[in-house]
């Protein structure tokens, strides 16, 4: 059976969209593992129902494997789970009102669960992180320079990095290349060459836009639950 990963992010309390994604995934052939790469909470709606569904999946749901994202990090900081840190980044960018709305959107009952989530996963030769290996808020886009992409991959020691912070869907490939380095020593300068294998960075999207990854074939499919196909089955070969 084909092994596939479904990667979602940016629901921000939207239980209806999560249910639509779960329903969509039931139509897809293969052995599917569901990863939720953060931003489950947000300031625009009450997030308790979605969080409860993630913690307590309904019969027939794919079990979600969750990590925390930027919005969870800001919430936990404001709630005292990050030492003396507060939600300064959110406060600076969105204002005090949004910080208060975020705090009010999540019942304190769920904070310990959010605080228990990991920063990211490393599966096979793939890194699954909300931002990047550098920072939870690191926003990788299609315009990020290749050297920065290579740095983020190298920090984790992976060949594939799945990221969600930008909310974009993209697949950037770093083809076989050679990195030259020059070392200055007492006995003279030396040049070293290091071959870099083919690597990739994938933006998984957000909200209704999600990504399906075929583990065996290394193929990426960008999907959404806004455009529903007429067929009841989605095979992807």
Please place each PLM-identified region on the residue numbering:
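N-terminal active-site segment of His-dependent metallophosphoesterases
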Residues: 1-53, 57-60
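Active-site neighborhood of phospho(di)ester-bond hydrolases with catalytic His/Asp-centered motifs
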Residues: 8-9, 34-39, 65-70, 129, ...
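Active-site environment of divalent metal-dependent phosphoester hydrolases
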Residues: 12-17, 42-45, 71-76, 136, ...
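His/acidic metal-ligating clusters that form di-metal
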Residues: 28-29, 33, 103-175
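Short aromatic-enriched loop/helix-cap "lid" or pocket-rim segments at secondary-structure transitions
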Residues: 77-81, 140-141, 173-176, 234-235
């Amino acid at each position: 059976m084909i092994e596939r990963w479904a990667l979602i992010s940016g629901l921000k309390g939207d239980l209806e969209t999560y249910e639509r994604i779960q329903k969509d995934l039931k139509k897809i052939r293969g052995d599917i593992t569901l990863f939720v790469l953060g931003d489950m909470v947000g300031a625009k709606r009450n997030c308790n129902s979605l969080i409860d569904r993630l913690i307590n999946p309904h019969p027939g749901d794919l079990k979600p494997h969750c990590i925390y994202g930027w919005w969870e990090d800001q919430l936990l900081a404001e709630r005292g789970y990050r030492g003396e840190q507060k939600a300064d980044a959110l406060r600076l960018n969105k204002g005090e009102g949004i910080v208060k709305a975020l705090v009010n959107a999540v019942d304190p009952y769920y904070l310990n669960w959010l605080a228990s989530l990991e920063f990211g996963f490393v599966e096979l030769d793939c890194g699954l992180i909300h931002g990047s290996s550098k920072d939870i808020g690191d926003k990788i886009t299609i315009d990020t320079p290749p050297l920065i992409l290579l740095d983020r991959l190298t920090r984790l020691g992976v060949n594939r990095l799945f990221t969600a912070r930008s909310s974009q869907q993209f697949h950037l490939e770093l083809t076989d290349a050679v990195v030259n380095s020059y070392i200055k020593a007492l006995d003279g300068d030396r040049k070293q060459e290091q071959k870099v294998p083919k690597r990739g960075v994938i933006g998984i999207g957000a909200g209704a836009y999600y990504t399906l990854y075929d583990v065996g074939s290394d193929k990426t499919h960008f999907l959404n639950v806004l455009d529903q196909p007429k067929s009841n089955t989605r095979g992807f070969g």
